[in-house]
Amino acid sequence: MVAEKKAKKSHEGINSRLALVMKSGKYTLGYKSVLKSLRSSKGKLILISSNCPPLRRSEIEYYAMLAKVGVHRYNGNNVDLGTACGKYFRVSCLSIVDPGDSDIIKTLPGDQ
């Protein structure tokens, strides 16, 4: 019960930091634009939903490893990640280019 409560609280913390990034920072949503941001070395942190296809996930993780960028696996599915971003569509992966006022890059562990 305690672990579940702690996981829920950290999940809410990620969501609030992500909402701050959406308001004040720069980001790219989607598989193709995430790969483009990794190839151009603009991405600082990558978030991948839990139900992202394994081939896409491994390709994003490979490009992130080459660019030395942290990858965080979001605990929710793509609908949850889209809702956390404040969008009305599904988001399987996103790249944070500029965190803005948020401290999400410092607080999230890179490889989880």
From Swiss-Prot:
One of its GO terms (biological process) is response to fungus. GO terms for cellular component: cytosol; cytosolic large ribosomal subunit; cytosolic ribosome; plasma membrane; plasmodesma. PANTHER family: RIBOSOMAL PROTEIN L30. HAMAP family: Ribosomal_eL30. InterPro entries: Ribosomal_eL30, Ribosomal_eL30-like, Ribosomal_eL30-like_sf, Ribosomal_eL30_CS, Ribosomal_eL8/eL30/eS12/Gad45. This is Large ribosomal subunit protein eL30x. Belongs to the eukaryotic ribosomal protein eL30 family. Gene3D superfamilies: 3.30.1330.30. It comes from the Eukaryota. GO terms for molecular function: mRNA binding; structural constituent of ribosome.
